[in-house]
Amino acid sequence: HGDQEVLNKIASEKIEKDNLIYVNFDINTNYIERSTCLEETGLELSEKVDYESYLREVARSHFILSPNGNGIDCHKHWEALYLNPVPIVTNSINIQHHKHLPFLILKEWRDFKESDISEAKYASLMKGFNNENLFFQNYCKELGWIK
């Protein structure tokens, strides 16, 4: 979906986090899931922007709302983790395999309003997280495929 060079550039800039939550996705990718997400959270979509501007907004946010798209694995989850906001997601088989990563996992979108969405919660979820663990070689080591 994205441009790896632009993603790496934004990641290297170490942008200060000054936004609590960012909401930007194409509602039509999975209309039922994503419209439910917006209805239940009470949040509004941000204005559509180009990819680099989108990544800058992701990088300056503590959390991003990341509903599933066409499947249970969404590139927004991984872009967010690489740029260090916490993706807010609903539980799925895929998310269960990544419990060691800093996701804020909701059973359903209606649970959002009772969730702790704060800078303190962000710090708690991110404690000890190193996005280098997302790199393929490190992931293979974690799975025991290479030493």
Task: Place the predicted regions along the sequence by residue.
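Nucleotide-sugar donor-binding catalytic core of glycosyltransferases
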Residues: 1-105, 116-147
